[in-house]
Design a protein with these regions (language model features):
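HIT superfamily nucleotide-processing domains
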Residues: 1-139
């Protein structure tokens, strides 16, 4: 398995080198909206510590990321009147991972509404900003 690349896009977001639609932050985790959401409110939660994926993350950091994912899921249920939540996490290329910094997807769901294809649609900035505010208000 290759090592962690400190120049991956999520590492740059964590360092403030790239913008994001932040939803939540604490000393160990950061959550922000996916700019190519599969559904409104699609949020990514990642550890601040360098970790390529579940195979090399510190177990305490992984546990904390999942606690934050639960908070985001609860907020998303309220903020988007969701009927359910999809949680996804991919590891290595063969497992579907595209950005090699551990991250968990939390996606609000509604019955009968299919998810958009991955990376198929870039949401408008004003919509993302409004969705981030809805989630923050529900936390």
């Amino acid at each position: 398995m290759p090592g962690y690349d400190p120049n991956n896009i999520f590492a740059k977001i964590l360092r403030g080198e790239l913008p994001s639609y932040k939803v939540y932050e604490d000393d160990k985790a950061f959550a922000f909206l996916d700019i190519m959401p599969r559904a409104p409110g699609h949020t990514l939660i990642l550890p601040k510590a360098p970790a390529r994926n579940i195979l090399d993350v510190n177990p305490d950091d992984l546990a904390h990321v999942m606690k934050v994912a639960q908070k985001i899921a609860q907020a998303a249920m309220k903020a988007f009147d969701a009927e359910g939540i999809t949680v996804q996490q991919f590891n290595e290329s063969a497992g579907g991972q595209v950005v090699f910094h551990l991250h968990v997807h939390v996606i609000p769901r509604h019955a009968g509404v299919a998810l958009k294809a991955p990376a198929s649609f870039k949401e408008a900035p004003d919509v993302l900003a409004a969705h981030a505010e809805r989630l923050k208000a529900a936390l």
